């Protein structure tokens, strides 16, 4: 597995569909201002700098998580934090690209 695949930048369409079939929650890790300028309907906004402090609340959702942001870099970081805390998650990449996969 290459570095980009490890960070979640491979072909995601199949994985996104599998996660959504399991009732995944989409967490947009952009800033509140970025989120307000446009986002995926039904997604939750938890900025990247708040992810670590929200782990318990995210675990209580008992759902897989698809993290997204503007380009995929911040969601890649969020994905690693979530995985390191035992949460089933994936990097959904940029929110506009992810929206087209739903």
Label each PLM-derived region with a short phrase.
Residues 2-15, 22-24, 32-63, 73-102:
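Rhodanese-like catalytic fold shared by cysteine-dependent sulfurtransferases
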Residues 28:
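N-terminal glycine-rich beta->alpha transition that marks the start or flank
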Residues 69:
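Short cysteine clusters
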């Amino acid at each position: 597995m290459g570095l980009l695949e490890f960070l979640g930048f491979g072909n995601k369409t199949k994985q996104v569909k599998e996660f959504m079939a399991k009732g995944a929650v989409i967490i947009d890790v952009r800033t509140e201002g970025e989120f307000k300028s446009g986002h995926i309907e039904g997604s939750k906004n938890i900025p990247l700098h708040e992810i670590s402090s929200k782990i318990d609340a995210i675990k209580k959702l008992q759902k897989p998580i698809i993290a997204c942001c503007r380009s995929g870099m911040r969601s890649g970081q969020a994905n690693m934090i979530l995985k390191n805390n035992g949460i089933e998650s994936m990097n959904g990449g940029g929110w506009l690209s992810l929206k087209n996969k739903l």
